[in-house]
Amino acid sequence: MTELNAGNAASFRDQVRAALVEAQNNIDIDLSQVEFVDSAGLGSLVALRKTACERNGKVRLINPSPHVQQILELTRLHRVFEIVRL
């Protein structure tokens, strides 16, 4: 996926939630191929963080592209999510 936007954000969120097994607390999301994210995409990431927090877990955003990293910083979400560079 190269974009996380209003057209696919709800589907993305639902697919990630469906893939979670009961004992899984943490969610790792590879953003290395995502070049664009809008407010709906950010909302889906925040919703997944809420899901993880309800399980006493966290969301890690893996290798966000420079543009996505900039959006995370502009929205201050880089303070909410753990950003991991591998």
Predicted regions and their residues:
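STAS-typified acidic loop motif
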Residues: 1-14
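Short, glycine-/small-residue-enriched flexible loop/hinge segments at domain edges that mediate gating
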Residues: 17-38
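Hydrophobic helix-cap positions at the C-terminus of alpha-helices
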Residues: 19, 48-52
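Residue-level recognition of specific faces of alpha-helices
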Residues: 33-36, 44-47, 70-73, 80
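C-terminal structural segments of small proteins and small subunits
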Residues: 51-85
